[in-house]
Design a protein with these regions (language model features):
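Compact, glycine-rich, soluble single-domain proteins
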Residues: 2-89
Length: 89
């Protein structure tokens, strides 16, 4: 099973696709999301969101926001989000 992931910033869709795992920093600490995860609404803190797919990882830097999980769909909403070269990595 895979996760359907969408990462959006206030002004644009940053990334979307399938993933096997999502790891993010929340106000309650780091959280890992796998297929079948219980529904969740989390508050993100500034840091990295790692989206792992088959053979590749997408690393995004967010300034905070929200993470929603429901029925193997993960939606990450941030005021600003940058992926890869955009994030200064």
């Amino acid at each position: 099973m895979t996760l359907k992931v969408e990462l959006v910033a206030a002004d644009r869709k940053v990334w979307s696709g399938d993933a096997s795992r999502v790891v993010a920093k929340t106000t309650d600490g780091d959280i890992g999301i796998l297929s079948g995860h219980a529904p969740l609404l989390g508050v993100l803190v500034e840091g990295e969101v790692r989206i792992s797919g088959e053979g590749s990882d997408v690393v995004a830097t967010v300034d905070g926001g929200f993470l929603s999980v429901d029925h193997d769909r993960v939606t990450i909403v941030a005021e600003t989000a940058r992926v890869g070269a955009e994030s200064g990595r």
